[in-house]
UniProtKB/Swiss-Prot annotation:
It is found in: Cell membrane. Its main location: membrane. SUPFAM superfamilies: P-loop containing nucleoside triphosphate hydrolases (SSF52540). PANTHER family: ENERGY-COUPLING FACTOR TRANSPORTER ATP-BINDING PROTEIN ECFA1, HEAVY METAL TRANSPORTER. This is Putative ABC transporter ATP-binding protein MM_0887. It is a peripheral membrane protein. Belongs to the ABC transporter superfamily. The lineage of its organism: Archaea, Methanobacteriati, Methanobacteriota, Stenosarchaea group, Methanomicrobia. GO terms for biological process: cobalt ion transport. The keyword Membrane applies.
Length: 327
């Protein structure tokens, strides 16, 4: 499907009663969790969430309310939502840090329980939003080695994994550095390296670009995309930054006040202004420029990345040149 084609009607709106687990949506007839690149997949999801609810003891309302979603091997998925939408709470269920009030989380078809939580954590690694919650050892090398050591690996294997992980994130030579002397972006890379060294099949990143300057943010996004493409790691990222999503995600889930509002490709999500308003989100900056051009009467299709924006601008210029030549 062309990126310039409006896709609003293809979005799966998860707040419709017809689209509860096991049913289909009224507009598309598709399973709501098999949109985008996962459509037509018959393999077992690497992560599956069924009717997940969670409530914190000090709150009356559910922090998560009947969440249903599936993540398939090799995907790059974004969970998009404003602050307080429930993204961090959702992610802490994915390897057993939090337990559901009701519903269940399955990893490779197995429900997370007290008995298998260690296995699940070997499959699903989590990078927390604040690296200071995760990077605690006196040196970078010790911090990255912590996970592999606790997996019972040999000293030689641990050393090899630490070396490979630091090379992957671009921090080779930082082994003896103290984490508290590093920048925020470097600490984030150390946290990612610590998870990489454990070689999980899935890495979950909670707001990985939060608090980073533009260059550090771009470096982290480039790294995690490389991890997906070169290592085949399934990636699940949460963010409130709408400008990040088009450059990372193949599929997007929109979370609002603990409820899954919609799922679809980035193009589909950002072609639904009503959904964005409801979820307290906005268009990516690139798309806002095209929206303003349309309001000025320019015949353009809204784009969401710099690359597709360039192509669309060139198309419009060539079209206008042809019209001028015909006069």
């Amino acid at each position: 499907m062309s990126k310039s084609t409006p896709l609003k009607s293809s979005i799966i709106r998860a707040d419709l009663p017809e689209q509860a687990e096991g049913r289909t949506g009224p507009e598309t007839g598709k399973d709501p969790e098999k949109t985008g690149n996962s459509e037509g997949k018959t393999d077992t999801p690497v992560i599956e969430i069924k009717d997940l609810c969670h409530r914190y003891p000090h709150l009356e309302a559910n922090a998560l309310d009947r969440i249903n979603l599936r993540i398939y091997r090799g995907e790059r998925v974004a969970v998009l939502g404003a602050n307080g939408a429930g993204k961090s709470t959702l992610f802490k269920h994915l390897n057993g840090i939090l337990r559901p009030l009701s519903g269940e989380v399955l990893v490779k078809g197995e429900k997370i329980t007290k008995k298998n939580v260690r296995m699940c954590r070997g499959t699903v690694g989590i990078v927390f939003q604040d690296p200071d919650d995760q990077v605690l050892a006196p040196s970078v090398e010790e911090d990255v080695a912590f996970g592999p050591i606790n997996m019972g690996l040999s000293r030689e294997e641990v050393k090899m994994r630490v070396k490979e992980a630091l090379e992957m994130v671009g921090l080779n030579g930082f082994e003896e550095r103290a984490p508290h002397h590093l920048s925020g972006g470097q600490k984030k890379l150390v946290a990612i390296a610590g998870i990489l060294a454990m070689r999980p099949e899935v890495i979950v990143l909670d707001e990985p670009t939060a608090g980073l300057d533009p260059l550090s943010s771009a470096r982290v996004l480039k790294l995690i995309t490389k991890m997906n493409r070169e290592l085949g790691i399934t990636l699940l990222l949460s963010t409130h930054d709408v400008d990040v999503v088009p450059y990372f995600a193949e599929r997007v889930f929109v979370l609002h006040h603990g409820k899954l509002e919609a799922s679809g490709s980035p193009e589909e999500i950002f072609n639904d202004p009503a959904l964005l308003r409801k979820a307290h989100l906005r268009l990516p900056r690139v798309a806002e420029v095209f929206e303003m051009l349309k309001q000025e009467g320019v015949d353009v299709n809204i784009q969401i990345t710099a690359e597709t924006a360039r192509d669309e601008i060139l198309r419009v210029i060539r079209s206008e040149n042809r019209k001028a030549e015909m006069k």
